[in-house]
Structure formats: structure tokens, C-alpha cells
UniProtKB/Swiss-Prot annotation:
GO terms for cellular component: cytosol. Transmembrane segments: none annotated. Mg(2+) binds at S235, T256. The gene is mnmE. Exhibits a very high intrinsic GTPase hydrolysis rate. Involved in the addition of a carboxymethylaminomethyl (cmnm) group at the wobble position (U34) of certain tRNAs, forming tRNA-cmnm(5)s(2)U34. This is tRNA modification GTPase MnmE. Keywords: Cytoplasm, GTP-binding, Hydrolase, Magnesium, Metal-binding, Nucleotide-binding, Potassium, tRNA processing. Belongs to the TRAFAC class TrmE-Era-EngA-EngB-Septin-like GTPase superfamily. TrmE GTPase family. Binds 1 potassium ion per subunit.
Length: 452
């Protein structure tokens, strides 16, 4: 997104479709002149004005509320005009066209995706983690995710990152001062307790990484794949977890030919449950395609549930399936149809007995799913996080570890010690956008809707 930030931008800020209220938003330098053209009068900043919205010809397009926010006290840090009218698509398009026409000589143009929030970031109204939280709040699919996004938007995550950054900068400042005045012959590592300071930093960073991983799970959810031979109850389990008849269930082996995906929530965590074609040798062309897709889904899985029929002994095909499952992916072997057994099912380590039809064992299955993915319901994770945040935190941890190795030597390697501290600081700064490439900014903001 290389467009100039010195010209006004305009867009419909509400979601597509019909609604009671729709909003057209304009942001840019000195919009008071545009307001006079649109309404024939001055607008008092931060006051609601009930006015007609008219075309250049005087035709009434709509009537509603106009709000004027003067820079820097606005969402973007620039002057902002918001026109709140009725939420019909045709009405909003006409209001937007009128704004573009009235502001043509001022350079008003259509906004690009995420451009309002990008301007808020560039004008220091929010940092990059908070800007991402705007999109996360819009996309939140559960109350827990919405709360986490709001916590990030309010700056809780950024405050934790900034606190660590400040401590690293302080330590680095002391190192640089020692390097600048070598004649003082100060034993830096001892005088400033560099080693215990590094240990405390590393411990606090490890805690932050663990919390960020929880935030990633809460934001992105888990990709859970149901895999196994035909007719072991994969579709029945999907329906039981979803609480609805999502997948077709018949006693005919091979009923499921293509994947069926359903999103459910457990403790606020979104789970994308994928029912797949049964795994077996077959000459059926269509079924073979479905089986090939099953293996692709298995490769993408965060958690694999390998379903088996508790009423049937494991055979060579079961062993072949297990041998081919990726070792890196958490696995739970689920024996279905335990309600048909004469004796209680005796589960071994890594196994669970359930009845998809009767609902037995499903609560335990839900708890196991979250545990396998690393979700800790008792852990403190008040904010959402992204994979890029975790990677940045991990890079910072690696640089602190390297600094610790240098600190285990003596003051002769202080320059290397200082460099690792600088790199750790840069990694943390990339989270909040204090040290971030334009390519990353473009990637982040391009995922926003146009009105944001």
C-alpha cells in the first residue's frame, strides 16, 4: 500500500448489505472545507448534527447525523468526517459518490483495505499490535476471542512487550557506556549484575511466549482432522460435536467422499473439525480422490483424531494408517461405539473410548482436544496474538540466550553482548511496529476490510 497519506480518503465503513444505519467515513487533512461544501455550514467538532445529505443539484439523498473530529483527536489522527445515514446499499453508495464529487479538487479518493487503520498507526494513534487487534475484533467468532482482541486493542499485550524492550534497552545502554569509556576499567558484568538481569529477562520472556501461544490458539483455533477407516463413526462424531446433522451418516462404507468442515467452540476456543473420507484401498476413482484429500488434510492438522471401531479388533490397515500419520502432530486414538461392548472399555495411554451416538466420553474428548493443542484454561492469556508475534518473541529469546553465553565469558566480548541485545530489542520492536518493514505493513493492512 504505497498510496500517499496526504490526501483525503473515503469509504463506506459499515458491512455490505442492508441495515438500520450505514456509515460513510472520510479522513484527511483539513476537512472543514469539505464539510462546508456538503452541508453549507460549519460543523462543531465532536458534536452530532442532524442534517439532510444532498446531491450537488440539491436533491435529497438521505438525512442523518454528521460528525466532525478534528485532528489529532480522531481514529486516524487526521480530520475525520462520518456521515451516518440509513443502511441501504444504494443510499450509501450515493452518499459516498457525493463525498468523492464534492472533494474531487481536494484529492479525495476511495480508501484501500485497512487504510484508515494504517493511517492511525502511522500517526501514532495505535501501535501495530493494536492495529492488528482491530481486525481481530471484527473477525472474533466467540466471546473469549472478542475479549482477547479488546484487551490487545487497549494495549495490554503491547505494554508487556514494551516493558521488556525498555529493560533490554537499559541494559544495552550500560554496555554501550562501558564500551565508550574503556579507561574506567569497570567490570561491567559484575557491577551492573548483567547475568542475573539476563536471567530475569529470559524468564519473563518465556512467560510472555507461553501466553502468546495461548493467544494464538484463541485467535486462530485448531484444525482437527477425523481420520480412520470407513464406517468407524467419523461423521457421527462430527455431528455429535456440532450438535447437528452436518454430515450424512449411513451404514454404507465410503459414504463421505469429500471433506466436511464444521466450526465449534470449546471454552471459547474455535475448533475447525474436518470429517474426511475413510482410508482404505479402493478402485473407485472418486473415492480415491477423496482419500488423497484426506491425507492432505492430515498433513495440515493441528490435532489428529484417529477413529477406530471399538467392536472390531485392530487390523493391518489400522497399523498402516498409524504408521503414515505425521509424528510431529498431536494424536489421540478414539475408539467409537463403546456403547455396543459387553464390558467397559479399557483405554490405554493415548486412547479414549466414546460413543458418538450416545454422547458418552464427549466431554473428556473436548478436554483432551484442547490439552493436546497446548491450551491451558487456567493460564493467563487476556489478549489475542498472532504467529508472527510468537516468532518475534522466540527470536528475541534466542538473542538473549546468545547474550547470556557471551556473559558467561568476560568483558572482552561486550561488543558481541551489546549486539545480541540490539537484535533482541529489534525483534520485540517488530511486534509493535517500531522496527517493521513496509512489506510487512502492506501484508497486515491489506487483510482489513475497506472501511477500516
Amino acid at each position: 500500500m504505497a498510496s500517499s497519506t496526504h490526501v483525503p480518503i473515503a469509504a463506506i465503513a459499515t458491512a455490505p448489505g442492508r441495515g438500520g444505519i450505514g456509515v460513510v467515513r472520510i479522513s484527511g487533512p483539513d476537512l472543514s472545507a469539505l464539510a462546508r461544501r456538503l452541508f453549507g455550514r460549519e460543523l462543531t467538532p465532536r458534536h452530532a448534527h442532524y442534517l439532510p445529505f444532498t446531491a450537488e443539484t440539491g436533491e435529497h439523498l438521505d438525512e442523518g447525523i454528521a460528525l466532525y473530529f478534528r485532528a489529532p483527536q480522531s481514529y486516524t489522527g487526521e480530520d475525520v468526517l462520518e456521515l451516518q445515514g440509513h443502511g441501504g446499499p444504494a443510499v450509501l453508495r450515493r452518499i459516498l459518490e457525493r463525498c468523492l464529487q464534492a472533494g474531487a479538487d481536494l484529492g479525495v479518493r476511495l480508501a484501500e483495505p485497512g487504510e484508515f487503520t494504517r493511517r492511525a498507526f502511522l500517526n501514532d494513534r495505535m501501535d501495530l499490535a493494536q492495529a492488528e487487534a482491530v481486525a481481530d475484533l471484527i473477525d472474533a467468532s466467540s466471546v473469549a476471542a472478542a475479549r482477547g482482541a479488546m484487551a490487545s486493542l487497549s494495549g495490554e499485550f503491547s505494554a508487556r512487550v514494551n516493558a521488556l524492550s525498555d529493560r533490554i534497552v537499559h541494559l544495552r545502554m550500560l554496555v554501550e557506556a562501558t564500551l565508550d569509556f574503556p579507561e574506567e576499567e569497570i567490570d561491567f558484568l559484575e557491577k551492573y549484575q548483567a547475568r542475573p538481569t539476563l536471567q530475569a529477562l529470559a524468564a519473563d520472556l518465556a512467560t510472555l511466549i507461553a501466553q502468546a501461544r495461548q493467544g494464538v490458539i484463541l485467535r486462530e483455533g485448531l484444525h482437527v482432522v477425523l481420520a480412520g477407516k470407513p464406517n468407524v463413526g467419523k461423521s457421527s462424531l462430527l455431528n455429535a460435536l456440532a450438535g447437528d446433522d452436518i454430515a450424512i451418516v449411513t451404514p454404507i462404507a465410503g459414504t463421505t467422499r469429500d471433506k466436511v468442515v464444521q466450526e465449534i467452540h470449546i471454552d471459547g476456543v474455535p475448533l475447525h473439525i474436518v470429517d474426511t473420507a475413510g482410508l482404505r484401498d479402493t478402485d473407485d476413482t472418486v473415492e480415491s480422490i477423496g482419500i488423497a484429500r484426506t491425507w492432505k488434510e492430515i498433513e495440515r492438522a493441528d490435532v489428529i483424531l484417529h477413529l477406530q471401531d471399538a467392536t472390531q479388533p485392530a487390523d493391518e490397515l489400522d497399523a498402516q494408517i498409524v504408521a503414515r500419520l505425521p509424528a510431529r502432530t498431536p494424536l489421540l486414538t478414539v475408539f467409537n461405539k463403546v456403547d455396543l461392548l459387553d464390558q467397559p472399555f479399557q483405554a490405554q495411554a493415548g486412547q479414549l473410548g466414546i460413543s458418538a451416538r450416545e454422547g458418552a466420553g464427549l466431554d473428556e474428548l473436548r478436554a483432551r482436544l484442547l490439552a493436546l493443542a497446548g491450551w491451558n484454561p487456567g493460564a493467563e492469556s487476556p489478549w489475542l496474538a498472532r504467529e508472527r508475534h510468537v516468532h518475534a518473541l522466540q527470536r528475541a529469546a534466542e538473542h538473549l540466550e546468545a547474550a547470556t553465553e557471551h556473559a558467561a565469558q568476560d568483558d572482552r566480548v561486550l561488543d558481541l553482548f551489546a549486539e545480541e541485545l540490539r537484535l533482541a530489542h529489534d525483534s520485540l520492536s517488530s511486534i509493535t511496529g517500531k522496527f517493521t518493514s513496509d512489506d510487512l505493513l502492506g501484508e497486515i493492512f491489506s487483510s482489513f476490510c475497506i472501511g477500516k
